[in-house]
UniProtKB/Swiss-Prot annotation:
Its EC number is 3.1.30.-. This is Nuclease EXOG, mitochondrial. The keyword Protein biosynthesis does not apply. Changing residue 140 to A: Abolishes catalytic activity. SMART domains: Endonuclease_NS (SM00892), NUC (SM00477). CDD domains: NUC. It comes from the Eukaryota. Homodimer.
Length: 368
């Protein structure tokens, strides 16, 4: 589906884009856990039997072998938590907290590998083989770049419980730019909470009927989402009296260029909750003054030149030869992008290192 048609459909629906509206506070839990609590409650017993329970035999019979379990309980890791969909082999939601200190450090993703989550039973897990040759990338919900402070935290983001099948261009492009904006928020907000996850939204057919259908990949039938969502909650500081800032966004799982603005994909929190079946930040006092993050902040993503310069700067560290390093500079010039001071300092430092290394190698190979 084209970006324009999706965006126009979302903008055209008053129910979907009803503005910055707070939803009702309702507890959210896994279906198995909810069922267990429901049938164990005295009120539920009365509803089922038409009378107040008194240790009835019916209750004992129902619970004799237990209720079905869905595995949707919250699973906590070093810097993220998630609820896992055992049927679709993807997370339902992933919650993370980021701050200026957490996005800085020595943790490096080159030491991390995608792997099944050891906490997920293999029967319900996705595997790397499901993604190989599928035409879909392994897309992080909690990104590795938000966990530079801890090698363990970063490695845990590579568990496949934190991954969904994502369009390659979306993963490396628009979604990446949203993640970068979340990190940028830590320059202006002390605490930033982010919830991300997949959506499978209905499509309207020519006959007017709505259909939910989605591709699955691999032997384990990992579900490919039609859309991805991200909810951002930012707090200026723990002692600030300034209202919290919140924004919810839904983007299609397909390539998105540089022209669409993030605000074009903004939805109300209430509408996202209806779509996802989730209640976000249930302990948040929604009767308090909560601001639209796109009004308080910019919601501005990096443009083409800024993003290209950022990627080129990252490539400097991976250059293994002077020739490769000079190619990075050449590509920038061909794109008519002017290097900034930070890029030049990194470039010159790397150039000096590589020249010294190549000169040292030449001297070692020189015959005596």
């Amino acid at each position: 589906m084209a970006i324009k048609s999706i965006a126009s459909r979302l903008r055209g629906s008053r129910r979907f884009l009803s503005g910055f509206v707070a939803g009702a506070v309702v507890g959210a839990a896994g279906a198995g856990l909810a069922a267990l609590q429901f049938f164990r409650s005295q009120g539920a017993e009365g509803a089922l039997t038409g009378k107040q329970p008194d240790g009835s035999a019916e209750k004992a019979v129902l619970e004799q072998f237990g209720f079905p379990l869905t595995g949707t309980e919250a699973r906590c890791y070093t810097n993220h938590a998630l609820s896992y969909d055992q049927a679709k082999r993807v997370p339902r939601w992933v919650l993370e907290h980021i701050s200026k200190s957490k996005i800085m450090g020595d943790a490096d993703r080159k030491h991390c590998k995608f792997k099944p989550d050891p906490n997920i039973p293999p029967t319900f897990s996705a595997f790397n083989e499901d993604y190989v040759g599928s035409g879909w990338s392994r897309g992080h919900m909690a990104p590795a770049g938000n966990n530079k402070f801890s090698s363990k935290a970063m490695a845990e983001t590579f568990y496949l419980s934190n991954i969904v099948p994502q369009d390659f261009d979306n993963n490396s492009g628009y979604w990446n730019r949203i993640e970068m904006y979340c990190r940028e928020l830590t320059e202006r907000f002390e605490d930033v909470w982010v919830v991300s996850g997949p959506l499978t939204l209905p499509q309207t057919r020519g006959d007017g009927k709505k259909i939910v259908s989605y591709q699955v990949i691999g032997e384990d039938n990992v579900a490919v989402p039609s859309h991805l969502y991200k909810v951002i909650l930012a707090r200026r500081s723990s002692v600030s009296t300034e209202p919290l800032a919140l924004g919810a966004f839904v983007v299609p799982n397909e390539a998105i260029g540089f022209q669409p603005q993030l605000t074009e994909f903004q939805v109300s929190l209430q509408d996202l909750e209806k779509l996802s079946g989730l209640v976000f930040f249930p302990h948040l006092d929604r009767t308090s003054d909560i601001r639209n993050i796109c009004s308080v902040d910019t919601c501005k993503l990096l443009d083409f030149q800024e993003f290209t310069l950022y990627l080129s700067t990252r490539k400097i560290e991976g250059a293994r030869s002077v020739l490769r390093l000079e190619k990075i500079m050449e590509n920038l010039k061909n794109a008519e992008i002017e290097p900034d001071d930070y890029f030049m300092s990194r470039y010159e430092k790397k150039l000096e290192e590589l020249k010294a290394k190549e000169q040292s190698g030449t001297q070692i190979r020189k015959p005596s």
